[in-house]
Amino acid sequence: MNVIEKIERQIKDNIILIYMKGTPQSPSCGFSAQAVQALSICGEKFAYVDILENLDIRKELPRYANWPTFPQLWIKGELIGGCSIILEMLENGELKKIISNAVLNSK
């Protein structure tokens, strides 16, 4: 499996997936920490990929997603965006709504 296939599999296999620096318990950058906190507030489980431990994904994902920075939030196979978008969506209530709908529709 090449790196693009690995990325596609991760995105397909996880309803809510964040590509981040570090882990949810120990984020390695402020943006990843803020994004994880926003996701945690929404109250649903999410998967993560630590790009610091997966350098091939760190290199290829920005090209694949056409999004240059991390973290990257994917919900039901769709790129939502990075930290600023996640925080904006949390503030206006859209993040909880989109996450709840994704989880409900997957059952």
UniProtKB/Swiss-Prot annotation:
Function: Monothiol glutaredoxin involved in the biogenesis of iron-sulfur clusters.
A GO-annotated cellular component: cytoplasm
Keywords recorded for this protein, A-Z: 2Fe-2S, Cytoplasm, Iron, Iron-sulfur, Metal-binding, Redox-active center
Single GO term (MF): disulfide oxidoreductase activity
Main location: cytoplasm
CDD domains linked to this entry: GRX_PICOT_like
Protein name per UniProt: Glutaredoxin 4
UniProt: [2Fe-2S] cluster binding residues: 29
Gene that specifies this protein: grxD
Amino-acid positions noted as binding glutathione in the UniProt annotation, renumbered to this chain: 21, 58, 70, 83-84
Subcellular location, record wording: Cytoplasm
Subunit structure: Homodimer.
Alphabetical list of NCBIfam families matching this protein: Grx4 family monothiol glutaredoxin (TIGR00365)
Similarity field: Belongs to the glutaredoxin family. Monothiol subfamily.
Keyword Hydrolase tagged: no
Organism expressing this protein natively: Buchnera aphidicola subsp. Schizaphis graminum (strain Sg)
PANTHER family: GLUTAREDOXIN FAMILY MEMBER (PTHR10293), MONOTHIOL GLUTAREDOXIN-S14, CHLOROPLASTIC (PTHR10293:SF72)
